[in-house]
């Protein structure tokens, strides 16, 4: 139990009438700030506490601790002919007088940038670009930063053909026949777009002026321009954000409303489909999230549906979520991805991990909030069902890791110059979610946990933090439940590799799925002909399954069923009649599906069943998608059964993939 000493400082708000009688200490703790001594955590975890919080980010070459960024202004020009963005960035800086060099030098991150000139308070300044240090780039060193505590830094630059922040597509590579460019800056690629303090620990407000022959979207609110120059697009971001959240795209973009504060942008040929896919749900998601946390702070919430090569499901660029076209399933079955990106408006964008070691604070919280949103709308069993799907994805992710001992821990250690992209996996998402779900459960359920959610996001709004700041806040908020919190095996949850302790999930929406999958595994070993299977199974079996249930069904089949009695040596490749019968009987819901999640799981089942006639279909499909969730495991699957086809397919399509995706697939294939 948490005891004195403590210092009491009154809060600006008192909520005594709404509190149940839980003891004076509880009342006090919820409504005043308690300044507690450190080392309140269990000793085993206290021993891991860093010397300072937030922990220093080792994935930057900048001296960001020596300066505060008061504002950032981007003045950019997009050239499709040169596949380059040029222009300038202007920082309003303040010296913090920390560190041994007392800010005599200013260090910024760059990567494959052509830095042309540097000016401080209008005067030209000397600078050097240090030798490249993989994978962190090249440090930009500016001497004699300024004799003033507050000063303006202007840097002129141009991106190069080695830029990892942008993907350029010529007119032949887009379905609309116009060139296109989009950015992807997370985790450490902002430094390849413009010189910056490329760390999530540094936030600033932004303005941007972007010249392009084609429409532009940006991670901010469009400022109406009264000038006659229609090729210049101006934006403002009033909420401080880190550099990695900047998002820029330019191409043949059209727009349509999808809610009172939301617009969808995409190429004209898919605009109507995108509008239909999103218009029923986006505002509902926003209002539901506001009830769980607090008011949406960013004003507008817009969505850019990107080109096919976009590598992620979505990117939470503030005001302008970047989304994959694989969300367009023509039945609104993938809309929950938008709930995830929307949830980032609080977790990740408003409250941010201080370094990529603590990425779970972004993504674990976001998955938790995403599932709270869909649970509030569709019911608690739906939330638990989504968690079951996530648990399976987590197991698959860890099983496929080349170094699970290192990369399956919740808190990472990237302090040896490891590229954060190399550590990217489902772990921070699903392991992080399961920790928060476990805390919700042991602390008394949603009614007990929701006040902490609001407190946490208000306390760290517009700030960056590490795991220990999260833990300290948790313990401070629940002083009367210290014994419960101490019972958590923090060492296992945060620092041990592998799967976490499994929470209890409601399986109501999964039970029928498991039963049908088990029946197929059982019957595959006994029935001999297609007619036999048609007499036992019917398309009506899955008629009422939603897309997530279909995904779980196919995934459970590849795991040889769910039953405790499932055969250990079962192999679908030994039962080709059963495999083909299943796909034939359920073809309307599975084979003909336009939902990319279902389609991918179908291909996975076909590979497990070694249906060789289907390998080419998977290879062709890999040329139509760019989302790494499908591309990377797709190539691994194909490589496991036909390496020659996998290599030929990658060679054919590699230049259509985003640079990050291309590099990671090369690693996966051992190239």
UniProtKB/Swiss-Prot annotation:
This protein's name: Leucine aminopeptidase 2
GO molecular function: aminopeptidase activity; epoxide hydrolase activity; metallopeptidase activity; zinc ion binding
Residues the entry annotates as binding Zn(2+): 340, 344, 363
EC number: 3.4.11.-, 3.3.2.10
UniProt binding sites for substrate: 184-186, 311-316
Lineage summary: Eukaryota, Fungi, Dikarya, Ascomycota, Saccharomycotina
Consequence of substituting residue 244 to F: Strongly reduces the substrate affinity
Protein activity control: Inhibited by 3-(4-benzyloxyphenyl)-2-(R)-amino-1-propanethiol (thioamine) and N-hydroxy-N-(2-(S)-amino-3-(4-benzyloxyphenyl)propyl)-5-carboxypen-tanamide (hydroxamic acid). The aminopeptidase activity is stimulated by LTA(4).
PROSITE patterns assigned: ZINC_PROTEASE
Cofactor binding notes: Binds 1 zinc ion per subunit.
Main enzyme class: hydrolase
Pfam families (UniProt xref): Leuk-A4-hydro_C, Peptidase_M1, Peptidase_M1_N
PANTHER family referenced in this protein's UniProt entry, alphabetically: LEUKOTRIENE A-4 HYDROLASE
Influence of pH: Optimum pH is about 7.3.
Record field: catalytic activity: an epoxide + H2O = an ethanediol
Cofactor(s) needed for function: Zn(2+)
Domain of life: Eukaryota
Single GO cellular component term: cytoplasm
Annotated organism of origin: Saccharomyces cerevisiae (strain ATCC 204508 / S288c) (Baker's yeast)
The entry's keywords: Cytoplasm, Hydrolase, Metal-binding, Metalloprotease, Nucleus, Protease, Zinc
Residue numbers annotated as active site: 341, 429
Outcome reported for the amino acid change (mutating residue 344 to Q): Abolishes the epoxide hydrolase and aminopeptidase activities
């Amino acid at each position: 139990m948490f005891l004195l000493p403590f210092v009491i400082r009154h809060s600006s708000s008192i909520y005594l009438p709404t509190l149940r009688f839980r003891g004076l200490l509880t009342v006090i703790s919820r409504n005043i700030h308690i300044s507690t001594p450190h080392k309140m955590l269990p000793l085993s975890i206290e021993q891991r506490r860093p010397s300072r919080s937030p922990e220093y980010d080792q994935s930057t070459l900048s001296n960001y601790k020596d300066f505060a960024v008061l504002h950032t202004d981007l003045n950019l020009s997009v050239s499709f002919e040169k596949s380059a963005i040029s222009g300038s960035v202007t920082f309003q800086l303040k010296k913090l007088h920390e560190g041994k060099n007392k800010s005599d030098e200013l260090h910024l991150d760059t990567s494959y940038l052509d830095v042309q000139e540097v000016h401080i308070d209008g005067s030209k300044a000397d600078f050097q670009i240090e030798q490249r240090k993989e994978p962190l780039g090249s440090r930009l060193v500016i001497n004699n930063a300024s004799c003033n505590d507050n000063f303006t830094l202007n840097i002129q630059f141009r991106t190069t053909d080695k830029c990892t922040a942008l993907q350029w597509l010529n007119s032949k590579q887009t379905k609309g026949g116009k060139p296109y460019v989009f950015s992807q800056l997370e985790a450490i690629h902002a430094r390849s777009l413009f010189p910056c303090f490329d760390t999530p620990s540094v936030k600033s407000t932004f303005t941007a002026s972007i010249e392009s022959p084609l429409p532009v979207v940006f991670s901010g609110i469009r400022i109406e321009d009264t000038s006659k120059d229609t090729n210049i697009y101006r934006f403002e971001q009033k909420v401080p954000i880190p550099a990695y959240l900047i998002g820029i795209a330019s191409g043949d973009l059209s727009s349509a409303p999808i809610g009172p504060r939301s617009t969808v942008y995409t190429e004209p040929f898919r605009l109507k489909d995108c509008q239909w896919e999103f218009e029923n749900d986006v505002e509902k998601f926003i209002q539901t999230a506001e009830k769980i946390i607090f008011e949406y702070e960013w004003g507008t919430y817009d969505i850019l549906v990107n080109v096919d090569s976009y590598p992620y499901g979505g990117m939470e660029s503030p005001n302008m979520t970047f989304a994959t076209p694989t969300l367009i399933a023509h039945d609104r079955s993938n809309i929950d991805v938008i709930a995830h990106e929307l949830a980032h408006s609080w977790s990740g964008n408003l409250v941010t991990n201080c370094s990529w070691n603590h990425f779970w604070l972004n993504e674990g919280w976001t998955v938790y909030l995403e599932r709270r949103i869909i649970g509030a709308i569709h019911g608690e069993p739906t939330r638990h069902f989504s968690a079951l799907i996530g648990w399976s994805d987590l197991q698959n992710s860890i099983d496929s890791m080349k170094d699970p001992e290192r990369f399956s821990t919740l808190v990472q250690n990237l302090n040896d110059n490891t590229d954060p992209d190399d550590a990217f996996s489902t772990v921070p998402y699903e392991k992080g979610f399961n920790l928060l779900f476990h805390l919700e459960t042991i602390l008394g359920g949603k009614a007990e946990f929701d006040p902490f959610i609001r407190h946490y996001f208000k306390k760290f709004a517009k700030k960056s933090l590490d795991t220990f700041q999260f833990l300290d806040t948790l313990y401070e908020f629940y002083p009367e439940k210290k014994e419960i919190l101490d019972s958590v095996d923090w060492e296992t949850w945060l620092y041990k590799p592998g799967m976490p302790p499994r929470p209890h999930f409601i399986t109501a929406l999964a039970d029928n799925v498991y039963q049908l999958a088990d029946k197929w595994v059982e019957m595959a070993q006994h029935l001999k002909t297609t007619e036999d299977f048609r007499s036992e199974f019917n398309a009506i079996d899955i008629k009422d399954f939603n897309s997530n249930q279909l995904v779980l069904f196919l995934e459970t089949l590849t795991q040889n069923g769910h039953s405790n009695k499932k055969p250990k040596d079962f192999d679908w490749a030994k039962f080709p009649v059963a495999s083909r019968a299943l796909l034939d009987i359920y073809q309307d819901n599975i084979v003909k599906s336009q939902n990319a999640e279902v389609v991918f799981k179908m291909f996975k089942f076909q590979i497990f069943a070694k249906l060789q006639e289907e390998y080419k279909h998977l290879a062709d499909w890999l040329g139509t998608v760019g989302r790494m969730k499908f591309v990377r495991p797709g190539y691994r699957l194909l490589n496991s059964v036909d390496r020659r086809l996998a290599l030929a397919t990658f060679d054919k399509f590699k230049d259509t993939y985003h640079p990050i995706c291309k590099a990671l697939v090369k690693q996966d294939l051992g190239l």
